[in-house]
Amino acid sequence: MTNLRKTHPLMKIINHSFIDLPAPSNISAWWNFGSLLGICLVIQILTGLFLAMHYTSDTLTAFSSVAHICRDVNYGWLIRNLHANGASMFFMCLYIHVGRGFYYGSYLNKETWNIGVILLLTVMATAFVGYVLPWGQMSFWGATVITNLLSAIPYIGTTLAEWIWGGFAVDKATLTRFFAFHFILPFIITALVIVHLLFLHETGSNNPSGINPDSDKIPFHPYYTIKDALGLMFLLLTLLMLALFSPDSLGDPDNFSPANPLNTPPHIKPEWYFLFAYAILRSIPNKLGGVLALLASILILLIIPFLHTANQRSMMFRPVSQTLFWILTANLITLTWIGGQLVEQPFIIIGQLASILYFLLILVLMPLAGLFKNYMLKLKW
């Protein structure tokens, strides 16, 4: 009798994706984050669904409905804390996942990489509209500041901003539509994840050496299912530690106050995972220039495959490129720190220098490091 998982039309898809999938034998723990992102997505959809059952998307009751969830709903505090901190874990895994792709040259699978960038943008959009829903001070003013950036677009900007708001300012209509967007986007993300995996399984996974691994493959199960389970254990442990012991440590204290359009907080800032882009936005004194820099900081990922100049795929054997990569990582951490500071010296100049270095590293220094490696390989030692 033939095995059901190899004959049943539905089981066959699961089998080819997670059980009998030929995987490179040498992929490291950095390859765990793809599956962890899948788990994060499931956690966010489930906790979000239960929150949506009790949340009301009205300016008068949104804030109190979130308080009601935490006080009166059975384990509502836990669901809310898991959802809020789950977003932080999601972005942590996401940035590591992108960083791994950048380091090991996975971006040369262009379709997979491009869908990944679209996924990143969609997740960022989802997180932004989700942050507005509790209708606290930072929710309201964050929504006002970021959506107001649309008005920087010449000619159609103001009309576009008012179209998004559903009025002349962020109000009831904005909150209602943001809730609708926040509900539908995770399902769009799920569809994009399937497309992402479809393209990945066309070429197969990359590996740390960057060499074609076709001659040495092992089945995904049990080797990588066990490895992923270990990663999952660490993820859940970290998430539960965050959600149970310090659930508000990554949030903003201003969000404990209900939204008040007449009182502007002294320092408007988004969640920590957007601070690097926010710092780049603020580093340019011109509104339109800042918006373009903000977009470029993310969309630059789309041109990375065309900036690859080295003969070797991975950075594993390219020490100069490795050094630049870790400088870029440190630079992004610096930008994240600057994004959370007040707009005053010395933070302004640090932010401007870090923003210049960010684009300089990706557009100029890293391609030059690849060419330098090619030149060194050609020398007869």
Curated annotation (Swiss-Prot):
Primary localisation category: mitochondrion
Entry-linked Gene3D superfamilies: Cytochrome Bc1 Complex, Chain C
Alphabetical GO biological process terms: mitochondrial electron transport, ubiquinol to cytochrome c
Location of the protein in the cell: Mitochondrion inner membrane
Pfam families hit by this protein: Cytochrom_B_C, Cytochrome_B
GO CC aspect terms: mitochondrial inner membrane; respiratory chain complex III
Keywords: Electron transport, Heme, Iron, Membrane, Metal-binding, Mitochondrion, Mitochondrion inner membrane, Respiratory chain, Transmembrane, Transmembrane helix, Transport, Ubiquinone
Cofactor: heme b
Domain of life: Eukaryota
Family: Belongs to the cytochrome b family.
Complex and partners: The cytochrome bc1 complex contains 11 subunits: 3 respiratory subunits (MT-CYB, CYC1 and UQCRFS1), 2 core proteins (UQCRC1 and UQCRC2) and 6 low-molecular weight proteins (UQCRH/QCR6, UQCRB/QCR7, UQCRQ/QCR8, UQCR10/QCR9, UQCR11/QCR10 and a cleavage product of UQCRFS1). This cytochrome bc1 complex then forms a dimer.
Protein name in UniProt: Cytochrome b
Organism: Planigale gilesi
Gene that produces this protein: MT-CYB
